[in-house]
């Protein structure tokens, strides 16, 4: 199962306590938009909706609980998953935390979550950027296998794909979320130097990257941002 923590929005951070609130089972664009606005703020995110998601997974959540180094600022942040985002703060005492999300095959992948965010870029701005951390249950036991959790971020046009179900290869020419070495954010593509057990401390996951920044050039006006959590195999 893949989990991605996104940077916080505006607010007052809570030092203790807090909660994780699932938005995944709600079809209301209002609730999905509310979660997405923790990534970029209400002035930047006009609306948001799922372009794809597993039918049984709680794949999107807003959290006010300190976890994995988030929130970086403000009081809340977004959690995007291809399984169950509400399990993120569970103790790591299971070999495989997750859920049977029932995702159909999409472009050669299973359990695909695509969040479509309609954003507005003000005049004078030319960069879209957000901070994130990738966490996974498939490290290290599934490194090099067909099960290859991943995270992609695209702008306006979505072109990622995999060769076929059972093939771990991910092609994403328009992706702008990479690790510090420029690799795709996947279990197979992000090596031991970037995914470690220590970085997942305090979560239910077995491995995580450091906090990373995704950035891409953008022109003023309306755009569509598409963060994607997926699982080839």
Give the residues covered by each predicted segment:
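Sec/Tat signal peptide C-region and signal peptidase I cleavage site
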Residues: 9-14
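Aromatic (Trp/Tyr/Phe) and Gly/Pro-enriched flexible surface segments
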Residues: 16-233
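Bacterial N-terminal signal peptides
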Residues: 1-8
